[in-house]
Every structure is written in C-alpha cells, then in structure tokens.
Amino acid sequence: MSGGTPYIGSKISLISKAEIRYEGILYTIDTENSTVALAKVRSFGTEDRPTDRPIPPRDEVFEYIIFRGSDIKDLTVCEPPKPQCSLPQDPAIVQSSLGSSTSSFQSVGSYGPFGRMPTYSQFSPSSLVGQQFGAVGVAGSSLTSFGTEASSSSALSQSSVVGSAFTQDSRALKTQLSQGRSSPQLDPLRKSPTMEQAVQTASAHLPAPAPVGRRSPVSTRPLPSTSQKPIENQEHRRAEVHKVSRPENEQLRNDSKRQIVPGAPSAPRRGRGGHRGGRGRFGIRRDGPMKFEKDFDFESANAQFNKEEIDREFHNKLKLKEDKLEKQEKPVNGEDKGDSGVDTQNSEGNADEEDPLGPNCYYDKTKSFFDNISCDDNRERRPTWAEERRLNAETFGIPLRPNRGRGGYRGRGGLGFRGGRGRGSGRGGAFTTPRGFRGGFRGGRGGREFADFEYRKDNKVAA
C-alpha cells in the first residue's frame, strides 16, 4: 500500500454477506489479518436486498468499525480522498496542525496511539498485540477529511482519479482482501457476521488510522499532548466509582480507623444505631498469620517458672477461699461446716474432716472418683443468673454475639421468642432462635408473642 494508492481516505461503500450496507471513510487495511477499518461509518441496513433478517438503517455514526475481509460481499469506492494543500517538504518543520482541531498529535515515527484510538491488543489477545493505530496517510501523507490534525513531515501529492480508476481500485482492494487470511482468533468478538468491533462514542476526537506503508522520513518528537487529559479524567472517574461501590461496612471501618488516636489500643466498639450488629472484632490480626522461625522450646520456657512460688501462691489462695466459705456458712446455716459438696460414692467422711493424707493431697482414688481441688459453695440454694453467667463465662469464654447491636431489632414485642436466662443474641426479631446459656422460653411480654401461654420451668404448657 506504499505505492501511493488512493484508497486511504476514500469514501467506501461496503456490503457484507448479511446484505447490510455500510458507508465510511477507508481507515486502514490489514492484509495480514484480512481486516478493513472504516471511520465515520453509517449503517444503511439491508435496503430491500433479499435476506432472511431485514435490518433497518441506523442514524448513528460510528467512530470506526473493523470488518472481516472474508465476510465482505461487495466493496466500491464512492469518492476519492479530498485533495489538500500540503506544506512544502521542509526539514525544518517538525510538526504542524490545523487550527480547527483540539487534540495534539503524537509522533508519526513512533507509531503511537493517536487521540483515544484503542490498539488492536484491546480487541483480541492474539498475534495482534502491540499493533497500534498511528498517523493517517500513505507513506506519511496527511489527510484533513477526518477532521483531525496530521503530520505533514512528508506529503505526497494526490492526483485526481477518474471513474475508471475507481473500478480498478475496487477490484484491487477486493483481491487484496481475498488473498489475506481470515483471523480465527477474532471469531468470538464479532457481534454480526461482518462487524468485529463497533465503537460509538460521544467524543469530538476522531481517532486516526495506522500508516500503511513506510515510516515518515523525519522522526518527529511528540509534544505535550492534551488528549491524555480525557484519559486521566476517565481513570479518575473510574476510581471514584470504585470508591462509591465499596461495601458500606468497609467505609464504616475506615471511618472508625481515622477516629482512633495513633498509638492507642483499639477496643471493641458497640454500635449504637443503624444496622451495626455485633460488638466489634475480637483481636483479628490484619497482617496475616504469625510466622514462626523455629519450634517452641518447652525446656527453656519451663525453666523460667518457679514451681515453689506458684505452689505457695496456690495454697494461699485456697486457704483464703476456705476461710471465706466458713464465715459465710456460719451466719446462714447456724451450724458447723457441713458436706463439702463432693459426692462420694462410698460416703466415707466429709470434706471438712481432716485429710489423713495431708493438705497437699487433692485426689484420693480410694475415697472418691472426684478430686478435692475445686469445691463450690455447698449451701443448698440455686445460684443467681449473674453467678451462673459469670461461671459459664469463666468456663466456656465469652461467646460472640453478632446481633447484640443497640440499634436494630431489639423490641420486646414482635413475633419472636425471647432468649433464655443467658441473654441470647437477639431479644426480639422475627422468629429468632434463643441462644441463651440456659435455654428455656420465657413468657411473652405483650404484642403477638403468645401471651396466652406460660412456659414453665419444666417446659409444660399450662393454659
């Protein structure tokens, strides 16, 4: 195509095998992949041509459409490229532009992207990667019919073409496309039997086609381009959209981070409203799991403990506890210390009797299966809910309560059962399962909460 052929910039009428006619300015021809690109394309539909699927014409003007050569039925040249007054071939001219355009031009010699014309690599992850659209023209010739700036570093005078030349050009163009191979990698991308890509934009910048032929003899230097500003603005908009589309809880988490004073320990927070369930996160590491370089040395760790001091401290605490129990028992029961609460299978003695084996013997398998280390209050009374809750917390730990936010659904009416003695997760809600420590459905307090029935301790229902 470097021989000065008048195809580039000509107005082309193209009919696909689907009997759809397109008109546009010839943009570029890829003989390797057998594709034709037209700019400023309009679709005129099937126009009463016999076809199974008639398609009406469209008013939209596409910036460019890339057609597959094997699916083109007919191609005719309607108008030659418009002749233009080019600057003289002066080596002092580095770059020139027309005043009517708004975007600056990147270097012809570097084959860089012009305006916002996407590269072929955006269309297919095939052998087209890296091939970009650069300057318009044949052997560096400039065109103004696209309404954009072009390089005038090397211009060819284009003579007027007669009607017979149009026919020869059309035949040669068809022959060139038929010789080129069809690219199977682009099959999943086409939306119709002919179009591979159709991009419709509202931008005033028209992309320029690739040079078909040799590179410009003068390698120009790219000037600071203003066409990169829309790209930066577009990326900035994408970043804003990405920020807006983040989950709301992540934003709340970031807001809480900003309010924490640097260096202060982060305590779990209770949400007070909205839909902030839970009391915060319990010690979740954000830097991933801990990495250990070597195995734990148990011998050196055990050597740090003084077993005698620990044993002495344990005995002191045990004696203090026994003294407290004796002081509490005497005014309540009015009698001496009774059974220690340890149920012996053979009923041999009580816990208040002196242990013949000494105070250091906490387990005697001859007397009982159970040990004598932990003895609770031996008074015959039921522990209060606070004591039982504290005991359960010491034994099993504090459970995670995901639904204990102060906002949300916490009403005492509603349709749910109320949690048991242990204050389960939700106090109301719609049919929430009780998660209390002791279970047991408590009676309703109003509303539609089965107020006609009373749930007793033994789970028997009385009318």
Curated annotation (Swiss-Prot):
The modification Asymmetric dimethylarginine is found at R401. The keyword Nucleotide-binding does not apply. It is found in: Cytoplasm, P-body; Cytoplasm, Cytoskeleton, Spindle; Cytoplasm, Stress granule. CDD domains: LSm14_N. The modification N-acetylserine is found at S2. Residues 1-81 form the Sm domain. PROSITE patterns: DFDF (PS51512), FFD (PS51513), SM (PS52002), TFG (PS51536). SMART domains: FDF (SM01199), LSM14 (SM01271). One of its GO terms (cellular component) is mitotic spindle. Keywords: Acetylation, Cytoplasm, Cytoskeleton, Developmental protein, Methylation, Phosphoprotein, Repressor, Ribonucleoprotein, Translation regulation. Residues 172-288, 322-359, 398-448 are annotated as: Disordered. One of its GO terms (biological process) is stress granule assembly. A motif (FFD box) lies at residues 361-377. Residues 410-429 have a biased composition (Gly residues). The modification Phosphoserine is found at S178, S182, S183, S192, S216, S227. Residues 284-320 form the DFDF domain. Disulfide bonds: none annotated. SUPFAM superfamilies: Sm-like ribonucleoproteins. Residues 269-283 have a biased composition (Basic residues). Pfam families: FDF (PF09532), LSM14 (PF12701). Residues 232-258, 322-340 have a biased composition (Basic and acidic residues). A motif (TFG box) lies at residues 380-400. PANTHER family: PROTEIN LSM14 HOMOLOG A, SCD6 PROTEIN-RELATED. Essential for formation of P-bodies, cytoplasmic structures that provide storage sites for translationally inactive mRNAs and protect them from degradation. Acts as a repressor of mRNA translation. May play a role in mitotic spindle assembly. This is Protein LSM14 homolog A. It comes from Bos taurus.
